[in-house]
Structure formats: structure tokens, C-alpha cells
Amino acid sequence: MAGIKALISLSFGGAIGLMFLMLGCALPIYNQYWPLFVLFFYILSPIPYCIARRLVDDTDAMSNACKELAIFLTTGVVVSAFGLPVVFARAHLIEWGACALVLTGNTVIFATILGFFLVFGSNDDFSWQQW
């Protein structure tokens, strides 16, 4: 039952994060859809770590280096997702209020992605690797 509660909590967190992103785009005072480009970063952020977990064996000495490279690449994607709205706001493509809403949405979405890997990352019967 704890897995179902975690899944519902993660779904709620994702919905709240996407709501902040949409508010930063669709409110009549902002009315610019440039911040939707951060959706690409949401999709790209878990990919390096997922690939590293599938390819490496924990007994190998190279596995630690491969996982650290994956975490480094994931960090670059996350920092880019936080930097893009700021660059858009500095270039006057979006308003600073929209930037704040998008950054709030980024925080919630990336916390949800981290929570997913913490909840479903173990190698038990309720693991995401079975999907």
C-alpha cells in the first residue's frame, strides 16, 4: 500500500509542477510560450542515469565512474533547465514573474523526478526496472 501512496504523491507533485509551468506561460499578463522548452529538459534529465544503471555491473570498477558521469550529465541538464528561463527573462522574451513561476515548476518537477528514483530505485519487487 505504501507504493500506491508514493505513486499518487508523485503524480500530484508532477501535476503541481506542470501547473506552475503552464501558469508561467498562459496567464494573460505573460502570454508567452517560450518557457515550454524546459519540457525537453524534463524528458532528458533521467536518461543518463537510466542508461548507466542498465549498462554497468556493480562489481566492476568502471561502474562507479560511469554512474558519476551519468550524474554529472544529469546535473548539466538540470542546471540548464533552471538557466533557460533566466536567460529568456534577461533577453526580455518572458517577464520575470513568468520566470519565477517556471523556476518554481522546475523545482517541483525535479523534486518529483528525484522522488521517483528514490522510491522506485531499489531492487525489490516494486522497482521501476520492471517497467
Curated annotation (Swiss-Prot):
Please give the start and end residues of each transmembrane region.
Answer: 7-27, 32-52, 69-89, 100-120
The protein's matches in Pfam families, at most eight in alphabetical order, are given as:
Vps55
Q: Which UniProt keywords apply?
A: Membrane, Transmembrane, Transmembrane helix
Q: Name one GO molecular function term.
A: identical protein binding
Q: Please give the chief subcellular localization of this protein.
A: membrane
Q: Which GO terms describe its biological process?
A: late endosome to vacuole transport via multivesicular body sorting pathway; negative regulation of growth hormone receptor signaling pathway
The entry's localization annotation reads: Membrane
- Which superkingdom does the taxonomy of this entry point to? Eukaryota
In the record, the note on similarity to other proteins reads: Belongs to the OB-RGRP/VPS55 family.
Record's subunit section: Interacts with RAB13.
Q: What is this protein called?
A: Leptin receptor overlapping transcript-like 1
State the organism named in the record.
Answer: Rattus norvegicus (Rat)
